[in-house]
């Protein structure tokens, strides 16, 4: 799973996921499913923000090619992926500027158009079950919840999906692709089922023990070049390092 994650996600997303797990004292070598889940969640958050701006009239617009003459403001402030201290500083600044109620838990985004914090969820289970779990944890009507699944389903607070259909379809397509790529490598079942994941981990550890005493032959063959997909972020100093092209999983 770790190899899959490193091949299929943008290196900056992988780096952010590594930092997040380290911050909570989790070992990505063991918690490989969580590693994959964090990377997926980060990517969805960034895709949610992609191309969405507020024009001079205060209207929400979608711009994919960027007009250097347009005075545009990012519609969404990305909070997910930031250091916790910085994230809370950003939230405090937003609340002081907009008058928004400060959330008890770190949300993922802030929507400047609708003036609300957003909690993004990506689930391997039923969307309504995960939605209820999120709502029960947050316990705030001020934070908007939007849940996506790997099967193309989604659920949002008061059926308000925030984004246009095309933007949401882009996210759903990416999640479905991740699911297909995992399935083709025999990783999907363990990603969905914790019991299967534990069984697979024990199997891998046993296999490593059996191979430890065998002679090792070093391969000089280089890894296949990763193909670059269409960039999903526009030029901006705020998230420049994160707007590199997404990487396509190399086929085995």
Swiss-Prot record:
Keywords: Acetylation, Decay of host mRNAs by virus, Eukaryotic host gene expression shutoff by virus, Host cytoplasm, Host gene expression shutoff by virus, Host mRNA suppression by virus, Host nucleus, Host-virus interaction. The active site is at residues 80, 108. It is found in: Host cytoplasm; Host nucleus. The keyword Calcium does not apply. The record marks 195, 198-199 as: Important for efficient shutoff activity and nuclear localization. Changing residue 28 to P: Drastic loss of shutoff activity. The modification N-acetylmethionine is found at residue 1. One of its GO terms (biological process) is viral RNA genome replication. The record marks 28, 65, 202-203, 206 as: Important for efficient shutoff activity. Gene3D superfamilies: Influenza RNA-dependent RNA polymerase subunit PA, endonuclease domain. It holds the Pfam family Flu_PA. Plays a major role in the shutoff of the host protein expression by cleaving mRNAs probably via an endonuclease activity. Also reduces viral mRNA accumulation. This host shutoff allows the virus to escape from the host antiviral response. Hijacks host RNA splicing machinery to selectively target host RNAs containing introns for destruction. This may explain the preferential degradation of RNAs that have undergone co- or post-transcriptional processing. The probable endonuclease active site in the N-terminus and the basic amino acid cluster in the C-terminus are important for the shutoff activity. The C-terminus acts as a nuclear localization signal. The C-terminus is recruited to host protein complexes involved in nuclear Pol II RNA processing. Belongs to the influenza viruses PA-X family. This is Protein PA-X. The gene is PA.
